[in-house]
Design a protein with these regions (language model features):
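Membrane-embedded catalytic cores of phosphoryl/pyrophosphoryl-handling enzymes
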Residues: 70-151
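N-terminal transmembrane-helix/juxtamembrane module of multi-pass inner/ER membrane proteins
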Residues: 1-25, 37, 53-79
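Alpha-helical transmembrane segments of integral membrane proteins
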Residues: 15, 37-45, 106-109, 130-134
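Structural signal for the C-terminal ends of transmembrane alpha-helices
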Residues: 2, 6, 29-36, 100, ...
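Alpha-helical transmembrane spans of integral membrane proteins, capturing the lipid-embedded, hydrophobic core
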Residues: 24, 42, 46-50, 132, ...
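Interfacial segments of alpha-helical transmembrane regions
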Residues: 28-52
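Alpha-helical membrane-inserting segments
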Residues: 30, 48, 52, 56, ...
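Alpha-helical transmembrane segments of multi-pass membrane proteins
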Residues: 45-57, 114-121
Length: 151
């Protein structure tokens, strides 16, 4: 395998940290080890993010940098680039876990992971910078809202 292929593969792996599956596993894991408040905050934030992004993508479709084909309403929404759901979920995880654990080293580690995740979406040509920025802003707003409401 060529070096460039390995790098691309690594970025695809990192990008999975913002996927629905990873976040669902994180929520279930937090619940199972007794972190029920964190689990609930993550669940509310991710569901809220999902619905807001779905509404935005329903009314404002933007092709990804590498255009994807779609043949149904849901695949069209998934093919839309704006805003980045991965960025939104990455920021949500960063803020909620950092606030819950209040640990500088964990916050620095999560910040690094989130930056790499965000960069991976650009590198893999899944989003434009403005998609990433909008997703990140949405993640911040939702996280702050959830921290205020879900206590």
């Amino acid at each position: 395998m060529l070096l460039n292929e390995r790098i691309e593969s690594a970025f695809r792996d990192v990008s999975a940290l913002g996927s629905h599956v990873f976040v669902f596993i994180l929520i279930v894991f937090a619940y199972l080890i007794g972190l029920k408040l964190l689990s609930l905050q993550l669940l509310v934030a991710v569901v809220l993010s999902y619905f807001i992004i779905m509404i935005i993508r329903t009314f404002y479709f933007r092709n990804r940098p590498v255009k994807e084909k779609f043949n149904s309403f849901f695949s069209k929404i998934d093919s839309s680039s704006f805003p980045s759901a991965h960025s939104s979920r990455g920021i949500i995880i960063l803020i909620l876990l950092s606030k819950y654990f209040n640990n500088l080293y964990l916050t620095l580690f999560l910040s690094f992971c989130t930056l790499v995740l965000i960069y991976s979406r650009l590198r893999l040509k899944k989003h434009f910078f403005s998609d990433i920025l909008a997703g990140a802003i949405l993640g911040v707003v939702i996280s702050l809202f959830v921290l205020r409401v879900v206590q």
